[in-house]
Amino acid sequence: MATVSMRDMLKAGVHFGHQTRYWNPKMKPFIFGARNKVHIINLEKTVPMFNEALAELNKIASRKGKILFVGTKRAASEAVKDAALSCDQFFVNHRWLGGMLTNWKTVRQSIKRLKDLETQSQDGTFDKLTKKEALMRTRELEKLENSLGGIKDMGGLPDALFVIDADHEHIAIKEANNLGIPVFAIVDTNSDPDGVDFVIPGNDDAIRAVTLYLGAVAATVREGRSQDLASQAEESFVEAE
């Protein structure tokens, strides 16, 4: 199963927190000390906590669970999308729309509209419209794709959230808490760990660190899914006998 070592984390700068004046005292148990007014995260805590989170995500994936990757900060946006797509999962990487989970009924209608517009753009419907109407629908399609493209094939609520930056994505975390969906999150020294089921104390800004987390999560999800496919193949083989 995918794991991450302390050496990997040091190389990626996972241990660098935020400036000491921005700290959240609830993160004290995970802070090693401070250097040049910047908090240093205790990787002896982070390594086992991250590997425990990976093991749990592996289990969820092996049960066909759906994992939603959330990271809407510009720096993490593309990496979040790439990681989710690489393991056939789902993502929100631009803006978290309030009610995305708690108001799923409405979101489902917007997804239906998105799919209708996609069909229209491909089957020649747009070509039959006036220039103005076609432009309006194209803009609507782009807007919906931007906000819902990563979840349009999710087909229902996710079984877990993997979040980059608990502070920035606090609305998503709150919605998941309300619905009892487990939250796995990178929590920096300025963030509140409350509401996060699997806290991963670490740098949430450095792109190398973010890429390290996402790469490991995507790998463990792929492994979990292949276990599920292998067991399905075994079952059908037994039935065939």
UniProtKB/Swiss-Prot annotation:
Q: Which UniProt keywords apply?
A: Ribonucleoprotein, Ribosomal protein
Annotated Gene Ontology MF terms?
A: structural constituent of ribosome; zinc ion binding
| Modification N6-succinyllysine occurs at | 115
Task: Give the UniProt entry's GO cellular component terms.
Answer: cytoplasm; cytosolic small ribosomal subunit
User: GO biological process: any one?
Assistant: ribosomal small subunit assembly
Q: What does this protein do?
A: Required for ribosomal protein bS1 (rpsA) to bind to the 30S subunit.
Q: How does this protein assemble?
A: Part of the 30S ribosomal subunit, contacts bS1. Some nascent polypeptide chains are able to cross-link to this protein in situ. In collided ribosomes contacts ribosome rescue factor SmrB.
Q: Which family does it belong to?
A: Belongs to the universal ribosomal protein uS2 family.
**Name of the featured protein:** Small ribosomal subunit protein uS2
In its UniProt entry, the species of origin is given as Escherichia coli (strain K12)
